[in-house]
């Protein structure tokens, strides 16, 4: 073999070895990069946690909040539960179908709903919560109210863990509800939540994402000033927004994640679905599942729903598509 041929063979061998090492290290690099990216995502997701009765709840997988309305006039007739059996069955159904939180409301916020006195709201809630606690003593419960004293009763007497307020702290004057806030003061419900030391759902009626972000930033700071640490944001679909504004907002809710707080979305069977498709709340389950899917893909951490089973299935499927390892009951 000539010296020239030997040199050529040596060069080819060296080239092949270099390629082998290059691709080997490239594989290791890509594998490690993928691992680091996944870990970074896990860390980001773990940032969203709330303290519920001494238990740390994380949002590595989205949670499902099942609705229990102890009212005679909520907009979706299928959600109205008044008798002892109806309330008990609904509580057990939410848990059996994989719901993480039971949200109890006694004041309908549908347009045109009659005013309910504070005493009547408390009476309805006491009845509903006593049945709930008998049936599901360990359930995580939120109370849907804008009234500070109602929130205090629910937390102190029945161990309710979360206050879900649709009035944006009373700042907005939702529907029939009077304003209890003046410029320069802290809203009464903010002060009550700080006193109770429970997580708080802050809902907005602002019609667009820009106004919402500005308002949320200010309101979150007020809550922080009072010592409220666990805050959940709700963009308030169906509240103070036109049909078009609701859908524009749905396309932009991921922008709320800049505030680094858990995001709750409640679009279950709402008019933004059936007004678009033609129908009513009863025929809006499919549309609800579609919008819940969009919400999850855009970063929703909690789905507030009437139909728990379908929402849990949506969470599982979207999680698989996103490559998440979900820890969902059921």
PLM feature segments, named:
Residues 89-105:
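Catalytic domains of carbohydrate-active enzymes, especially glycoside hydrolases
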Residues 5-6, 26, 325-329:
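Short polybasic linear motifs
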Residues 62-65, 230, 262:
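Structural motif
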Residues 52-53, 76-93, 109-127, 131-134, ...:
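Active-site-adjacent loop and "lid" segments of alpha/beta metabolic enzymes
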Residues 9-15, 21-22, 28-38, 42:
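Short, positively charged and aromatic/hydrophobic N-terminal segments
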Residues 42-71, 323-326:
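N-terminal amphipathic alpha-helix/helix-capping segment at the start of soluble metabolic enzymes
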